[in-house]
């Protein structure tokens, strides 16, 4: 009988707060479970340099390569900590899947840039490494995002009713899992990104811990309506977005400068919740259960806004109820995609991205 295989997934999302690594166990292409997690926060200097690359500037190519190397050393450190915590050696791992750090996402131009020096990561970890997952989907005419609906479908689908899985990272994305049709999904809009940027600008804090600042504010209805009028929300799916559309400077064009900073933050929380509600209502009105993952689940103000928007129509849950910690889901997805690559299984959710066909995602690097 063939032994089961272990994979590591490493994910650093649009919140740019650090790198998550998750250990999963597979039997060929069959998911058996997640077994461990490690997290390495980004140093402030690294985070600032990554944010600087979001905008055009001098010597971008050199800076991006240097940051790719620094990120890969940090990723290797995170993988090593995970292995140590599980009493494992690199030789115990079949492959490592690394998403990299997105700095540009431009599907309208056929590219999405994730920083990672994958050969260096393979060399540092001594583990076969799979990465550059988005390029293959883009080459097939897709958006290159979101890539997680196929993973959500493999783990979370129910054969009796439509479920949705909501990931709230810097960007929020939804996977819709009908019982009798292919999964689909798309980016609903900003998740934590604008809230984090506003908190950093006005309190010099990385994020609004437990929604404490937002809880002191009131929703500004006129501002909310102006934000909701962005044309992205009226576009049909498949669609994806990022900082290119929803950066702090975009928000500031709608402000007159006299708004209370707590009120703006409170409004941004409702903005995220409302765009999720509108997306589900338009694209998957028969959804009855929604499972939530990502950093946003730790914000009680945002969770209360989601509950108020959905009311009794949709029941909200954590993915922990489906046996996967909400902080582990995205990194686990890229471990799963590495397993798909090894087993030559198409892992692309082409119904979500708009690609012309299912694809085996990623490129592999031996150490």
From Swiss-Prot:
- Annotated organism of origin: Neisseria meningitidis serogroup C / serotype 2a (strain ATCC 700532 / DSM 15464 / FAM18)
Nucleotide-binding as a keyword of this entry, yes or no, is: yes
Please name the pathway.
Amino-sugar metabolism; 1,6-anhydro-N-acetylmuramate degradation; Cell wall biogenesis; peptidoglycan recycling
**SUPFAM superfamilies this protein is in?**
Actin-like ATPase domain
Listed binding positions for ATP are: 13-20
- One GO MF term: phosphotransferase activity, alcohol group as acceptor
**Protein name according to UniProt:** Anhydro-N-acetylmuramic acid kinase
Family, as annotated: Belongs to the anhydro-N-acetylmuramic acid kinase family.
> Keywords on this record?
ATP-binding, Carbohydrate metabolism, Kinase, Nucleotide-binding, Transferase
Source organism phylogeny: Bacteria, Pseudomonadati, Pseudomonadota, Betaproteobacteria, Neisseriales
InterPro entries documented for this protein: Anhydro_N_Ac-Mur_kinase, ATPase_NBD
Reactions it catalyzes: 1,6-anhydro-N-acetyl-beta-muramate + ATP + H2O = N-acetyl-D-muramate 6-phosphate + ADP + H(+)
* The EC number(s) this enzyme carries: 2.7.1.170
Q: What role is this protein assigned?
A: Catalyzes the specific phosphorylation of 1,6-anhydro-N-acetylmuramic acid (anhMurNAc) with the simultaneous cleavage of the 1,6-anhydro ring, generating MurNAc-6-P. Is required for the utilization of anhMurNAc either imported from the medium or derived from its own cell wall murein, and thus plays a role in cell wall recycling.
Q: Which GO terms describe its biological process?
A: 1,6-anhydro-N-acetyl-beta-muramic acid catabolic process; amino sugar metabolic process; peptidoglycan turnover
Q: Does the keyword ATP-binding apply?
A: yes
Gene3D superfamilies of this UniProt entry?
A: 3.30.420.40
